[in-house]
Design a protein with these regions (language model features):
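Small-residue-rich helix-interface/hinge motifs
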Residues: 4-78, 293-314
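Alpha-helical transmembrane segments of multi-pass membrane proteins
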Residues: 13-17, 68, 101, 105, ...
Length: 356
């Protein structure tokens, strides 16, 4: 592995986690919550400065950071403590880290698209001569693939992603929605047997797809938005594949696995410019991934805190009481232990893959 790409991967992790914590910090300040310390990096402090109520620190290891708020882990009578804030302030503070990750992913993609000349589309480009559903009542060249089995096609690459992620029967039956002159058309397609020019048989749907939309400011903005939404959907499909058994533990990657992926992407790029662009695009995906994963309603994650916040809000209105803070803390601590245990297992698995 190239040391340059390894360092780049570590830097990406550090920056994205720091951006996440910056979101919590800015939201806390906006809501009047006292932040006792805001640190970039982990480990011993190599620089620190007290400004007002907050200690700002730069720590030795560039692998994230933290935002320590008053009343975050225990009850505090201080009006500026987190536990004394209202529902909406708490919701904003808990969600702000993930929102900053989404914003980071969006901005990275937008800057990558500034130099784009055009964007590939999922338009039907060619039909096999033996394709059984040609014509107005079937599929025509120029039709745009809008959705497959209920999954919206935002980008050219989505067609392959969706076909890989969704369960299919033995005939590969798909329900496809096409756009033709602004009208949505429903079509059912199955895999067919075809013969190539060398006489070799193969199974396929019988069409190729790909067009080009010219780039301008509005299309760049549109495809940046679509790409960001698509990143979120990619994470959802990955979770869905884990739950339905299409993927397993062996397909999960932790920091070591992602460092390996970033290194491979860099080394397989044709030149330095392509390496920078490809790694930046992967960083955007990781940023959005961090945002989505942190919003999952699991203990110790921001989503778990939001879950308890909502449950407590409902409980106060219906029963006049809330879940004891100590119990919630125990749940988050237990969740943290389980998540750290899972991370250890995945890390060992990632290291094993490197040497096998």
């Amino acid at each position: 592995m190239s040391i340059v790409y390894i360092l780049a991967a570590i830097l990406i992790f550090g920056v994205l986690i720091a951006v996440h914590e910056l979101g919590h910090f800015l939201a806390a300040k906006a809501c009047g919550v006292r932040v006792n310390e805001f640190a970039i990096g982990m480990g011993p402090a190599i620089w620190k400065k007290q400004k007002g109520d907050t200690l700002y620190a730069w720590r030795a290891f560039p692998v994230g950071g933290f935002c320590a708020m008053e009343g975050e882990e225990d009850d505090s009578n201080d009006p500026a403590s987190l536990n004394n804030q209202g529902f909406w302030c708490k919701l904003l503070i808990f969600a702000a880290g993930a929102l900053m990750n989404f914003l980071a992913g969006f901005l990275i993609v937008f800057f990558l698209y500034i130099g784009a000349k055009g964007f590939y589309t999922a338009d039907i480009a060619k039909l096999n001569p033996d394709f059984p559903q040609q014509g107005e009542s079937g599929v025509m060249v120029g039709d745009r693939i809008y959705a497959i089995n209920g999954e919206r096609v935002y980008l050219h690459s989505d067609v392959g992603l969706i076909l890989q992620a969704i369960p299919l029967d033995e005939n590969g039956t798909i329900e496809m929605i096409l756009l033709r002159d602004g009208e949505k058309l429903e079509r059912t397609l199955t895999l067919q047997d075809y013969t190539d020019e060398n006489g070799k048989s193969y199974r396929a749907y019988g069409f190729t797809y790909g067009g080009m939309e010219e780039a301008n400011f509005l299309t760049r903005l549109k495809y940046t938005c679509l790409n960001t939404v698509d990143f979120v959907r990619t994470v959802r499909l990955s979770i869905q594949m884990l739950l339905n058994g299409q993927a397993g533990m062996k397909d999960l990657s932790g920091p070591v696995g992602i460092v390996t992926t970033i290194t491979n992407v860099g080394e397989q790029s044709e030149n330095t410019r392509d390496a920078i662009d490809n790694i930046a695009y992967l960083a955007a995906l990781i940023a959005v991934n961090l945002g989505v994963m942190n919003l999952l309603p699991l203990p110790a994650l921001d989503g778990g805190k939001i879950f308890f916040l909502v449950v407590n809000g409902i409980s106060r209105k219906v029963f006049g009481k809330q879940i004891p803070p100590k119990f919630e803390n125990y749940v988050h601590y237990a969740g943290l232990v389980l998540l750290l245990g899972l991370m250890v297992v995945i890390t060992f698995q990632d290291v094993w893959k490197i040497f096998t």
